[in-house]
Design a protein with these regions (language model features):
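Non-catalytic terminal accessory segments
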Residues: 1-61
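Generic detector of short, well-ordered, non-transmembrane alpha-helical segments enriched
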Residues: 33-34, 66, 181
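Soluble catalytic domains of enzymes that build or remodel membrane lipids, polysaccharides, and related
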Residues: 75-326
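Alpha-helical transmembrane signal-anchor/signal-peptide segments
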Residues: 62-71
Length: 326
């Protein structure tokens, strides 16, 4: 019925374009009232929107590989060409196609990264959501390692638990799953990595958001402990929520060269063209997708590997980010 009405409205609009002035000025018997015009137009727009969202469900596993070359001031030659793959917001509890997820992991490995970084939200609520996909994500390997951090969904805050102990156990189980997959989870801590004789720091903090409704477990000062005054040419930070960058990182930690975040998903809905990008999420997050720079500091916000809520991607595809340092 809806499609028939949409077709009839389209036919009517087409007839208006081709109508002569004589026909247009004919008796009101054949004219359409303003109310009917508005209702049919609304029906057409509604049909187009519905069709768009249905089509968007076919994009939920259509991984988009975003490649960028990022210049870091004072980067030693040994670190130039360092290739980092970032993924974020896996949300394994939303998946329904292991083959498609495995293909996404294969696409990551085809990039031959030196380092793989995951910036939080591996589940929707429960650690058990990850279990069917652990064998797939265990395939992620890189010479310098696979590192991860936590996002707001990883704490189990959005589900009713039998008791407080069950919630705590869920998080401990999830931490163990990271380790079982060969991922090193950084929770307010850092590691020193080396390539070609040059060392650099990778820091990871728990979820920290400038938005009141999201948790502030991240402790960047704690992540610095033991780092001291080492004159390292590069510091990379994993922090799930991009609002952390403006609220704390840029002003208080100017030595962090690159921050990697996720969280927004680009709202899984928007418009991306070579010359512009738009999504409703930009009215909530100043930095919501892609690269942002302020002087020598940079933030990259990944659009997410998975999906949550709406089982699709309309205009904003799931993302695998490949960053090559220069």
């Amino acid at each position: 019925m809806l499609l028939g009405d949409v077709f009839r409205l389209f036919s009517w609009l087409t007839s208006l374009v081709g109508a002569s002035k004589t026909v247009a000025s004919s008796s009101s018997e054949n004219a359409i009232s303003r109310s009917v015009f508005l209702s049919r137009t609304a029906l057409l727009l509604g049909g187009l929107m519905l069709g768009g969202f249905v089509w968007g469900t076919t994009n939920r596993y259509r991984y988009n590989i975003k490649k960028l070359r990022l210049a870091i001031k004072g980067l030693p030659d040994a670190l130039k060409g360092l290739k980092i793959v970032q993924i974020s917001d896996i949300h394994s509890g939303s998946f329904d196609n292991k083959e498609a997820v495995a293909h996404g992991v294969a696409q990551i490995m085809e990039q031959h990264p030196d380092l793989i970084l995951f910036t939080g939200d591996i589940v929707n609520d429960r650690a058990s959501e990850l279990e069917p996909y652990m064998d797939i994500f265990s395939r992620l390997k890189a010479p310098l390692g696979v590192f991860s951090t936590l996002g707001n969904h990883d704490y189990g805050d959005y589900v009713q638990w039998e008791n407080a102990a069950a919630k705590i156990q869920n998080l401990e189980t999830l931490k163990g799953y990271h380790k079982q997959m060969g991922w090193q989870l950084l929770m307010n801590e850092h590691v020193i990595l080396e390539k070609g004789g040059a060392s650099f720091a990778l820091l990871g903090v728990e979820n920290w958001s400038a938005k009141a409704r999201f948790p502030k477990h991240g402790q960047l000062q704690k992540a610095y402990e033991g780092l001291g005054a080492q004159a390292l040419p590069l510091k990379i930070l994993m922090s799930h929520d991009p609002s952390h960058w403006d609220a704390q990182i840029r002003s208080s930690y100017p030595d962090i060269d690159l921050t990697l975040s996720g969280h927004t998903h680009g709202m899984q809905f928007g418009i991306e063209l070579p010359w512009m990008k738009w999504s409703p999420v930009q009215y909530m997050y100043k930095q919501w997708a892609g690269l942002y720079s302020d002087g020598q500091q940079h933030l990259y916000v990944n659009r997410g590997f998975g999906f949550l809520g709406y089982q699709g991607r309309l205009g904003i595809l799931p993302e695998i980010t490949v960053i090559e340092l220069a």
